């Protein structure tokens, strides 16, 4: 599975709300020897793949042209809507 990701320049609650309103959601990639990277992912592309078992094993994120292999570490969902609020990915 491969997803396109964009590095986030704005941080905070307001920036995250603007992302969600635009059909994206914030996420972070951490682990390994590299520094953590805040990214934004397309909500519809990710939510449609989350019901597949392969999603939780290994994912390739294309972050500014570089391919990073990750695994979902944590998913924060909306309380009653079928929406993802935030995701944590760990490098593998």
UniProtKB/Swiss-Prot annotation:
This is one of the proteins that binds to the 5S RNA in the ribosome where it forms part of the central protuberance. The keyword RNA-binding applies. GO terms for molecular function: 5S rRNA binding; structural constituent of ribosome. Gene3D superfamilies: Ribosomal Protein L25, Chain P. It comes from Aliivibrio fischeri (strain MJ11) (Vibrio fischeri). The lineage of its organism: Bacteria, Pseudomonadati, Pseudomonadota, Gammaproteobacteria, Vibrionales. GO terms for biological process: translation. CDD domains: Ribosomal_L25_TL5_CTC. Belongs to the bacterial ribosomal protein bL25 family. GO terms for cellular component: cytosolic large ribosomal subunit. It holds the Pfam family Ribosomal_L25p. SUPFAM superfamilies: Ribosomal protein L25-like. This is Large ribosomal subunit protein bL25. Signal peptide: none annotated.
